[in-house]
Amino acid sequence: ATAHYYMTVMYLIKAARMVGNEFDVRYYSSLAYDIMVAFNKRFLDSNTAQYGTGSQASNALPIFLQMIQSTGDKGDYTPDASLTAKVLTNLIKDVESHGNRLTTGDVGNRYLIQTLARNGQHELIYKMFNHEEAPGYGFQLKFGATTLTEQWDPRQGSSWNHFMMGQIDEWFFNSLIGIRPSTTLSASVNEKDEPMQGYQKFVIAPKLVGDLKYVKSTYETLYGTILVDWTRQNGTFTLNVSVPVNTTAIVYLPGEKELKEVQSGTYKFVAAE
């Protein structure tokens, strides 16, 4: 609850900046800092780099919100990079110790998945869900589910039509497909950055994981439909993209540092894996 309180206040700061209300910016900035300090004082064990009970949700949430800080001047929200790395290591170890399975519930699922994604742990996410055991989507499919079920094990008699386990969709679009709004008018591929509103300029940076050979999807924007279609075959990566009119795409091919900036149209890119 305290972490979500902090997140809400950070949104109020953003809203105040958007409308030019400097008084509210100062007021809520001070409040957010006090919340962050109180949160770390109450829940962080700096000796072990664990939050609360050390569960996946307990450690993922403060990493996601970038509120891990041991010291700092009032109004400074810069996370402690060293301490954050240690908490992330504990989080990864916990996932691995459970056989690459999650222990989070509905509230914590998104924070776990996105914390791992934003820190480059795409292979681990793939392992977490590419199986037919509970907890996992494959287990639901195994028992004939055509919509998300309320429980990971649909045999428990709960609802067979629940959206609350759908947080994986964000990883599908932002990472596997790789479509994200650009964070600035210049190129950016940092998944931790705050995105700009709209898709007049966007990033296509697909992540290749495991034995996944084919991904195709469309994304509807105010400017039109973005299409991404990629395949892996015999060591060759092929990417087809469709960029809507009056938009610009910044394309990153796996393994290549040089970006490709393209205007509206249809394009094909080929690269070695």
Language model feature labels by segment:
Residues 123-273:
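Non-catalytic C-terminal accessory modules of carbohydrate-active enzymes
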Residues 4-160, 266, 270:
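Catalytic cores of carbohydrate-active enzymes
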